[in-house]
Amino acid sequence: VSVLKRVGARWMTVFTLAWLAIWTVQLTPVQLLLPLQLNTSDDDWISGVVSSGFVLGIGGLAGIIAGPVAGALSDRAGIGRRRRRPWAIGGAILTAVFLVVTGFSEGPWAVGGAWVGVTIGVAVSSAAFTALIADQLPATQRGAASAAVGSSQAVGIVLGVGLVVLLGLGIRDGYLLLAALIAVIGTGAALILPDPPAPVEPAPVAQASVMNDRRLLASFRDRDFAWMLWGRLVTNIGNALGTALFLFFLLHGLHQESVVAQDNLLLLIVVYTLFVVLASVLTGIVSDRTGNRRTLTILATLVQAASGVVIAVVPTFEATMIAAALMGLGYGAFSTVGLAFAADLLPDEKDHARDLGIVNVTAALGQLIGPVLGAGLVALVGGFWLVFVAAAVLSLVGGALTALARQPARPSQDRDLSQDHAQPQEP
């Protein structure tokens, strides 16, 4: 097995730019463009919320399926062929094409179909760029690369929404800007970053596949690991409930004009992101020093729950700002310390990468379920109060489920996975 050499600043810079483009084109439509595109008149605004939940739901499902499939196919590239670059370029181009299609689409079905194409493209390119971390970086640089992915997520949503709002772009022009961004930066980064040909190694035998399947079942049977997964899933649903419908809440819950609501959405996103980053850094340091990740993870869910209570009790923009800060604090701490806690609980060191992938899928599933559930709750009561109450309750339930997982007596000193944290989801 060849020894991986450290990469330089150029590699890290290009890699970070690639992820900045990916996060920007993925999160800007979710938070701003799709809600504006699917928004309906005040007399029938609930149908717009339901349509948005539907579109985000089917898009998220497509992405969850496409990412692992694309990753597995790129792993199986023929001997001597490039494994990651073709998929990264193909995903970037597919994303750009369907962003344009989405911009010209009208109605929930057409927009939903086009958005599925976008999420598949994003998932394919994300899988390819993520694989570069394991392919090309030594263990001493993987944490830095993962931190670059996470920080670019935080910057990406602010950058995307900020460009559209501050430049005064319409919905279609916003999509065209995003398409150009991913086409240029995504493909450019894929061409610049090295992609060594697939090594000459025999394919895994069928028996190994069977053993992997058995070990997967064993991971789910591990008591503490299973409780942690359930807690992570439910907490992420609570986070998605509290953040996915922010623009609709400003428009129809607080009855703000569209231009004012867009400006205020940008402000909420900046506040949320600032506190996510702050909490991530501080709690990461504290958890490394104390080792008591379980307690910190549970406390984070309590802070997240408080944000839902604030909006439900005091539905004003000022209270929403406070709630965004609390949500950022809670989820920033949960996403960082929660994954470090998950790393402590991984059942078998032979399956760390696979089991950590399962942990990350639970976060993605939560962000998929949240908008759909939120749209249903809005339709049920004709308002937003139940959405935020449910966000608070689910956050508390997530903390209770996490509490059922026992803190290991001696946390491993060799796992640097707390740096590979599941980064904050979009507000």
Where are these regions (language model features)?
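Juxtamembrane intracellular "pre-TM" segments in multi-pass secondary transporters
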Residues: 1-9, 196-230, 419, 423-427
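Helix-loop boundary and gating motifs at the non-cytosolic
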Residues: 2-60, 226-262
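Intracellular juxtamembrane helix-capping segments at the cytosolic ends
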Residues: 34, 124-137, 333-348
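A membrane-interface helix-boundary motif in multi-pass transporters
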Residues: 46-48, 83-85, 166-181, 375-395
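Glycine-rich segments within core transmembrane alpha-helices of 12-TM secondary carriers
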Residues: 63, 143-165, 360-371
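Helix-to-loop junctions at the C-terminal end of transmembrane segments
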Residues: 66-81, 279-292
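Structural signature of the two symmetry-related core transmembrane helices
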Residues: 84-100, 295-310
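A late C-terminal transmembrane helix in Major Facilitator Superfamily
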Residues: 350-380
